[in-house]
Amino acid sequence: MSEKRLQKREEISDEYKWKLEDMYETDELWEAECEKASQLAEKLSGFKGHLADSAATLLDFFKKQDELSYYLERIVVYANERSHQDTAVSKYQAYVSKAETLTVQASGALAFASPEILQIDDKRLESFYSESNELMHYKRAIDEIMRQKEHTLSAAEENILAQCGEMAAAPENIFSMFNNADIKFPYITDVEGNKIRITHGNFIDFLSSKDRSLRKQVFRGVYDSYKKWSNTVSMMYISKLKNDTFYARVRKYDSARAMYLSGGDIPESVYDNLIETVHAHLPALHRYMSLRKKLLGVEHLHMYDLFAPIVDNVQTTYTYDEAKKLVAKALEPMGDEYVSILKSGMESGWIDVYENENKRSGAYSWGAYGTHPYVLLNYADNLDSVFTLAHEMGHAMHTYYSNEHQSITYAGYLIFVAEVASTCNESLLMHYMLEHCEDENERKYLMTHFLDGFRTTLFRQAQFAEFEHIAHRKMQKGEPVTKDVLNELWHELNVQYYGPDMRVDDEISYEWMRIPHFYTPYYVYQYSTGYSAAVAFSKKILEEGKPAVDKYIGNFLCGGCSKNPIELLRSAGVDMSTPKPVDDALNVFEDYLKQFEAATK
């Protein structure tokens, strides 16, 4: 049995590590800022009962709240990123815990604010605005509070709910510990005779193997493991459904979906439009499954065949330096300024590039106001890693532009638009690579990568969205929600989405149990809507050039949360209140599918 040893962090060159010192030069400075934040939270609680006193008092409160947000963002990001670079360091585990405690303290200290602001009558507020031009800066923030008027409870009740926060997080925290630490998958023997334990990290790699018996072995190994724990995992999720139903009821929302979508001021019709439009295009996904079956040369297509390669990859490795150049070249349609900032970020401590022992898996972009964004990668010299770099730098550039052009009050863009900039970059990269590849086989390989991007993001996340909405509706109506009900629902959705050429294996009924996003309700649909908006923007940028780029950067990337997400996207040229962007994106999928069908005849 051979095993490649992961590098220790100190063995990796500093040029491939992020510079967290740009936030705090020393840990002592972080600790000092924690103390400042704690004291400021106490000061803010002293405003209780006085927000309606005068325009000056209300303004002072909002300014101090912004100051607290500034500290807390930095405190939380630094603690987590220090911990993520080496999760075995107990000092930084303690920092994460301290940051969480501070956040809860701040939440409790501010619990009085929204109910109190809601008690200020409209005439008095208008007189405050007349007295203070500075207070006008906070009008949108105040309007957002007023929008939640009928769903905000008394100060005492809000304080109780704030203190329930850690208890309410129990289903997610229990699932996270179970899924990341406790569940163990079996060992398998790979094609070279190595005995390897299946993990979350290598699961998809194994499912991407050309060896069908290995894929089947891994598939069954993972889902049989969840089956053993299925009663327990089901109860975790059912508890989450009960939580959501409780909070929706006490806050006087019609449903959990209405509650979660109200945070971003997203009409529920956007959710319904997505699922209905995806349903209308499912025949195209069924065609893709039929083509996959043909190209794999199998009598029956199974769920463990979804990631199997159907075209040989021509170039299997892309070094990190090659990836940086490729991404920068592909994003040239975004203009000189964008590319210049992008290149600078890739060279000046924004990115933690390579995997090391105990480093957090996956990839993300995260930053705090007042410092540059940070990107965590586990770069692996493959095509997926190149696209991940483009994706995460899309997030980072969005953060950079929003922070540069908005105050801290309105810099943080909302989840609904969070995946747009990242996926737009991926779309531009794919376009560039398809335009510049000369090898027909490489072109086919890239097309499968693009088509699978639609399958795993637009279609699959819509399937997730449909599952969690039906589950929440059942809970709200008082219908029985059990392990068997959830398993059957997930199985039926797989039959519907993948079509007649797919043999939907029994084991797939347990797949929903391994999806962490279900503990962040009504989140995943935004991957599908974001993907659709991104495809629309990339098309405009390539076809219209500078005018489209100027609107995209000036109105969207620089916009933060200065408008609600639908208005923000509309002002940049894409209207997500209609089914059109989703329909247009799925038409692009069908266009590429036709090209791929023709190329593989």
Spans of features found by a protein language model:
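C-terminal, non-catalytic "cap/extension" segments appended to globular domains
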Residues: 11-12, 25, 113, 117-120, ...
